[in-house]
């Protein structure tokens, strides 16, 4: 019995020892298999950007066919609203990046999306507030519906809501670019940026299929509330899911080593880490790299915002308003083209880096030159509208895809040349100048279209008369903006030159 007991104890001991050895043998396999939490973060950025653009699109899809009927808006009124949004977006962007760097990615992003979601929902109260202010004698006497004063009240209320929306939305891209720099090595950043930036196209793609239907079924006010409320859900998920990769339990050592592969490659040529170099706000403006990014944003952002804000109104002018099936399909197909093609925006420079041996910045600049040629087709949109409305739809889609591919690489140039501690700040500075460019195009477009419509056939441009001539002028600018921007960027920063001191 004693011998049998000792034998059993020995067997048990051997089994425990074998289990421990087996565990030790398995652990390296489990550890070395790289996790992919960085792509979960990229998916979160994609959804945030989708919500961002859907909130921005609600007004452009409801003003012409729903809101203007209540308040008698003109193109100039709408142009003023979009221009003020652009200018406040630009102004807040100047500080949003610094705010994200100071607050931190997690808290800063939550603040941004909560503010813009609140601003989106507040639009729903503008109708009630306009009628209430008009009826209660706030302006000395009851304001008659349909008068200039009544219209002005509604415009100012929408302006206030757009300002709140702009305050929050200005933080989206600085935060997203900072997350991309935290979670991806340089060679993957353009691709990751193109993936989350596709959210802007998907948001614009989903908007015409949902917003006009909601507005027609339940009122334009409800469309603002439902779309705006989605942002609060995202904020709750972000608070639960995001941690810096060094602190995240969902990132193992293998993935962390891959994320930090840039630092390992560069430690022989520099003794300071990216995260450690601190740039003051004023110092950022002393670098040519900053001004290259500024030029790239200022000359091209307005093109995308023009397509975003004015495409539904343009198709409505051609006889296909957003509350018709064809009008909705035109916007859907336009942004479907943008979404599908823009994804390759980050893949092309990756091919240049891996197959041609180019550094990331050189690969991006070559890809951006290729993408800069796509918007040239925009100058043919208006002349071909008389043949078929689907031709300008496809052409604007190609131009929009060129912009999104360009934009993904433009944002990634920041991570190529600036320390991580300054990425959100530089993004905010560039976004501010992009917003200024958007202000000029949107306000100028509204003024131009109203003037051209009033002049009728006496207003001509390249053989096109009246209001269509106004669109022709803007389309021509859209066609050449990217080639001009690329040329100036190349003059400012001819070769890859990271900022290390």
Give the ranges of each region predicted by the language model.
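C-terminal transmembrane helical hairpin of 12-TM major facilitator-type secondary transporters
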Residues: 362-409
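Multi-pass alpha-helical transporter architecture, strongest
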Residues: 237-242, 378-383, 471, 476-501
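Cytoplasmic helix-loop-helix junction between adjacent transmembrane helices
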Residues: 161-200
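Helix-loop-helix hairpin linking two adjacent transmembrane segments in secondary transporters
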Residues: 201-246
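Extracytoplasmic gate region of multi-pass secondary transporters
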Residues: 59-61, 287-342, 407, 411, ...
């Amino acid at each position: 019995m004693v011998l049998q007991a000792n034998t059993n104890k020995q067997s048990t001991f051997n089994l425990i020892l074998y289990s421990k050895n087996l565990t030790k043998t398995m652990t390296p396999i489990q550890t070395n298999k790289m996790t992919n939490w960085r792509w979960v973060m990229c998916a979160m950025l994609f959804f945030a950007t989708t919500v961002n653009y859907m909130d921005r699109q609600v007004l452009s899809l409801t003003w012409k066919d729903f809101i203007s009927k209540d308040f008698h808006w003109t193109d100039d009124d709408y142009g003023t609203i979009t221009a003020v949004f652009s200018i406040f977006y630009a102004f807040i962007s100047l500080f949003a990046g610094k705010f994200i760097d100071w607050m931190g990615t997690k808290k800063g992003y939550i603040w941004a999306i909560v503010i813009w979601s609140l601003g989106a929902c507040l639009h729903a109260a503008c109708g009630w507030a306009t009628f209430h202010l008009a009826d209660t004698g706030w302006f000395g006497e009851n304001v008659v519906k349909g008068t200039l004063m009544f219209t002005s009240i509604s415009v100012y209320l929408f302006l206030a809501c757009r300002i709140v929306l702009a305050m929050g939305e200005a933080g989206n891209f600085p935060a997203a670019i900072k997350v991309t720099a935290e979670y991806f090595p340089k060679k993957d950043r353009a691709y990751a940026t193109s993936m989350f930036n596709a959210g802007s196209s998907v948001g614009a793609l989903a908007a015409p299929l949902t917003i006009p239907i909601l507005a027609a079924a339940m009122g334009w006010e409800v469309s603002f509330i439902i779309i705006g409320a989605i942002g609060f859900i995202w904020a709750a998920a972000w608070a639960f899911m995001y941690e810096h990769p060094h602190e995240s339990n969902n990132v193992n050592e293998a993935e962390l080593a891959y994320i930090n592969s840039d630092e390992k490659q560069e430690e022989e040529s520099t003794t300071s880490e990216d995260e450690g170099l601190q740039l003051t706000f004023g110092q950022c403006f002393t670098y040519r790299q900053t001004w290259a990014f500024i030029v790239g944003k200022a000359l091209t952002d307005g093109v995308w915002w023009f397509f975003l804000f004015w495409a539904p109104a343009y198709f409505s002018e051609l006889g296909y308003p957003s509350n018709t099936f064809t009008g909705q399909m035109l916007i859907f197909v336009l942004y479907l083209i943008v979404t599908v093609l823009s994804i390759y925006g980050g893949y092309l420079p990756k091919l240049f880096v891996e197959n041609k041996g180019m550094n990331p910045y050189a690969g991006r600049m070559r890809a951006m030159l290729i993408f800069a040629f796509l918007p040239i087709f925009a100058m043919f949109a208006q002349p071909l509208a008389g043949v078929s409305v689907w031709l300008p739809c496809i052409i604007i889609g190609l131009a929009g895809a060129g912009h999104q591919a360009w934009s993904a690489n433009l944002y990634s140039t920041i991570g190529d040349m600036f320390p991580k501690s300054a990425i959100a700040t530089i993004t905010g500075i560039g976004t501010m100048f992009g917003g200024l460019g958007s202000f000029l195009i949107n306000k100028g477009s509204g003024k131009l279209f109203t003037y051209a419509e009033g002049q009728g056939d006496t207003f001509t441009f390249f053989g096109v008369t009246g209001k269509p001539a106004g669109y022709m002028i803007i389309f021509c600018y859209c066609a050449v903006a990217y080639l001009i921007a690329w040329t100036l960027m190349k003059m400012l920063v001819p070769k890859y030159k990271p900022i290390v001191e």
